[in-house]
């Protein structure tokens, strides 16, 4: 068994959940085994402490998941994907969205520079709406100039 596959099979529930989340949303930490293990261990500790404090399993799980995903709710990829999916369904076919977003992401990376995507409440802030609008404009300009490649 290769090292990567072995490391995956050794991950806890929280580690596997986090790895899936990081990969699905294209976070750079997806390749950082130490980061994943530390976060997973911390989430397990939060769960255990919450249970010792007499919280119900559901409440303990909620606290553990919050600790696991702290600062990892919003990725550049997932926000841009949402923009393309929601605002450009006629221009970019569903089967082309992932490739289109992957192509476009480095071109619009500077748009994200003034926003704190690690804020777990970012989606409820006016900044989220502003970022969404800026990305929508950037995508529209790209499509107008280059089409959908």
Task: Give, region by region, the residue ranges found by the protein language model.
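C-terminal alpha-helical interaction appendages
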Residues: 1-149
